[in-house]
Each structure stands twice: as structure tokens, then as C-alpha cells.
């Protein structure tokens, strides 16, 4: 296989691996649609706002701000967000990896410190903040939490795209 073809070969099984638990838990996920959407909206807001706050506090320029603001969504979405504003896409990819790996490593401690024990809270937190890497980590222990995390990851990405395109131009003019 040449270049990234092996990744494309593994993408199909990876999608099925995430989709099967969604199918199994579909009735509960439908019942939780409103809290899932609200949690994803909050997660997307916190993800973008925390990235912007850190970058502005550090005095970074707009190109870096755009990249850091997209840290809590999946890499393809982060690259599109960053690219659409003229940011540094490779930095966006690195920030996404840091957020994902950080969440996958630290989630147990964070959940314990903040007393997060519900499947909904754990899934929403990981899907919104640590995207696919965090979702895969949760899936090891609980298909339900992994399913919630998958929905949160997708919804947060859609909301983050909308949020960044509606707010970043205004925020950076100030």
C-alpha cells in the first residue's frame, strides 16, 4: 500500500466499530437527545472558548488562535476550521492530538476528582473534549459511554464549526 492507503483500508472497520454500539443503544440515545445536544453545545463552547482564552492570554497571533480554537474536535474538522480562517493546519492537528491523548490518559483522574460517575456525564465529557481518541478509550470499559461519547463527538464538531464561524471573526476584531 502506498502512503496513507492503509489508513483508508482501516477506516471502514473503525466506523463500524463505533456504529455498532450506537445501534445497540439507539433507543436510549434517542431518549437522551435533548441532554446530548445541550451537553454537546456546552462542550463545544468550552472547547473553543478555552482554546481562545489560552491563546489570547499568551498573546498569540490570529493564525495560532484559529488553530488552538479547534483543539476539541476531530482532526479533519479542526483542519477545515483552521484552514477556512487561514490558520496553521499542522498546529491544529497537533492540538487535537494533545487534547485527545490528554483526555484518554487523564480522564479517570478527572472523573474521580470532579465526582463524575454517570454514563451520560462521562460520555459527554470525553466526546466533547477528547473526540475519537477519548471515545475509543471509553469504549474499552463501557459501550454505553462510548456510544454517548460518539454522539457527543459528532454533535460537538458540528456545533463547533457553527460557533467558530459565527464568533471568531467578531472576537478577533476586538
Question: PLM features: what roles do these ranges have?
Answer:
Residues 1-21, 31-39, 43:
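Helical membrane-embedded segments and adjacent short helical loop/helix-boundary regions
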Residues 25, 60, 108-121:
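Membrane-embedded helical hairpins/re-entrant loop segments and their flanking transmembrane helices
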Residues 164-170:
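Conserved small/polar residues in nucleotide/adenosyl-binding loops
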Amino acid at each position: 500500500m502506498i502512503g496513507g492507503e492503509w489508513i483508508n483500508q482501516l477506516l471502514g472497520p473503525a466506523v463500524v466499530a463505533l456504529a455498532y454500539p450506537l445501534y445497540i443503544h439507539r433507543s436510549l440515545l434517542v431518549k437522551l437527545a435533548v441532554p446530548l445536544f445541550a451537553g454537546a453545545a456546552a462542550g463545544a463552547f468550552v472547547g473553543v472558548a478555552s482554546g481562545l482564552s489560552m491563546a489570547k492570554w499568551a498573546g498569540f497571533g490570529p493564525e495560532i488562535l484559529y488553530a488552538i480554537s479547534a483543539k476539541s474536535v476531530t482532526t479533519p474538522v479542526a483542519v477545515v476550521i483552521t484552514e477556512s480562517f487561514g490558520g496553521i493546519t499542522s498546529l491544529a492537528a497537533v492540538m487535537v492530538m494533545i487534547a485527545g491523548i490528554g483526555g484518554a490518559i487523564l480522564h479517570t483522574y478527572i472523573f474521580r476528582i470532579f465526582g463524575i460517575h454517570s454514563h451520560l456525564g462521562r460520555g459527554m465529557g470525553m466526546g466533547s473534549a477528547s473526540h475519537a481518541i477519548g471515545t475509543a478509550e471509553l469504549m474499552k470499559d463501557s459501550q454505553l459511554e462510548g456510544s454517548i461519547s460518539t454522539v457527543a463527538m459528532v454533535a460537538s464538531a458540528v456545533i463547533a464549526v457553527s460557533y467558530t464561524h459565527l464568533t471568531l471573526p467578531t472576537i478577533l476584531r476586538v
